[in-house]
Amino acid sequence: MSSIPANLPLRNDLIGEEPYGAPQLDVPVCLNVNENPYAPDPAVCDTIAKRVREIAPTLNRYPDREHIELRQAFSDYLARESGTRLDVDELWGANGSNEIMLQLFQAFGGPGRTALGADPTYSMYPEYARDTFTGWKLAHRNADFTLNVDKVLEAIAEVKPSMVLLTSPNNPTGTPLPMEDIERILAACETAEVVGAGEGVHPILVIDEAYVEFRKPGTPSAVSLIKDHPNLAVSRTMSKAFAFAGARVGYLAASKGIIDCVRIVRMPYHLSAVTQAAALAAFEHTDEQLSRVEHLRETREATAAWLKEQTYKDQPLEVAESGSNFLLFGGHFDKREAIFDELLKRGVLIRVVGPDGWLRVCKGTDEEMETFRNALVEVLRIVEAA
């Protein structure tokens, strides 16, 4: 990085690296980071302000480092959302699911250890591996982005990872992960070896469910498997469907053993009193916070159908199956950066991510999606002719 003086003792493996992050630009239509586009209702804002005001006189003291009340709120929410009641000591909170994932890598990764994923996958995972000196290996998905379970099982046997990390629905493709696939991989992890570990040590399976509330109704969550599988950890967030990205609250559901491992590496008092108060206030309004999820699902399906009717260089656009609030589309964009740039000129920010030839767009308000559609039709013709 040119801005870093050469005389600073930056780690050798970080020299030349750039900070991770999607473009953060002030444009009218932001459809690039998979947020819920609808702001919290005024009643939710009032409750957040009330909760924070109540704890303000205590800010000279450290917060509850075990955040017991918030963990109970996670339990109540999962019982409602996924039909599974977990104990408080089977839950853990952090500053976004990014911190949850980093804590998992800190606890179960490290020098001599390897984590296994399936590409294309979330681009932060190799960053967590790098930051914790953990090896990072990949098993390749099928051409339609569904998980190739046989390849994952082969990689588990060959790599002997300490963690297997899968996203459901997948990011950046949106692909759902069937429960039977999760159960097959869990079974393999329960007997697999971990390189460099002692006899009887087996890998954990981490399922990242950041977007799970957008799944098709009736689809179970991996949380329902935790009671029977102590080697399973499920990461969740309040940033997506719950419309709470600015508060930075993620949480982990897992056996008490896994939670206790994560507690070893957590920073003291890592969740501020303000964060805890705001999250508790949001959970008081779960119905309101999730009220737009069904509409966003409908928007996803309508947008997918519309995209399939569009063409680029006389070929219809491909759209990956999605159980999330975003769509990966294109498939044969030979100038995807040019399409991105032309959309940006028109005030629409999407994401260049995933395999070559594809772009990703998340679901915005009805007005934002209309702007996106109108801009894309114009842009595809311009880029074709260039």
How would you describe each model-predicted region?
Residues A107-Y128:
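Conserved PLP-anchoring active-site segment centered on the Schiff-base-forming lysine
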Residues D41, N231-Y312, E318-V319:
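PLP-dependent aminotransferase class I/II
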Residues W136-H140, M163-P169, I204-E209, A320-S322, ...:
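Short beta-strands and strand-loop turn motifs
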Residues D26, V88, A320-F326, G354-W358:
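Short Gly/Ser/Thr- and Asp/Glu-enriched loop/turn motifs at secondary-structure junctions
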Residues S2-G96, Q103:
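N-terminal small-domain helix-loop-helix segment of the aminotransferase-like
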Residues R297, E301, Q310-R346, K363:
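Conserved PLP-binding catalytic core of the aspartate aminotransferase-like
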Residues E180, D341-R346, R351-A386:
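PLP-dependent enzyme catalytic core of the Aspartate aminotransferase-like
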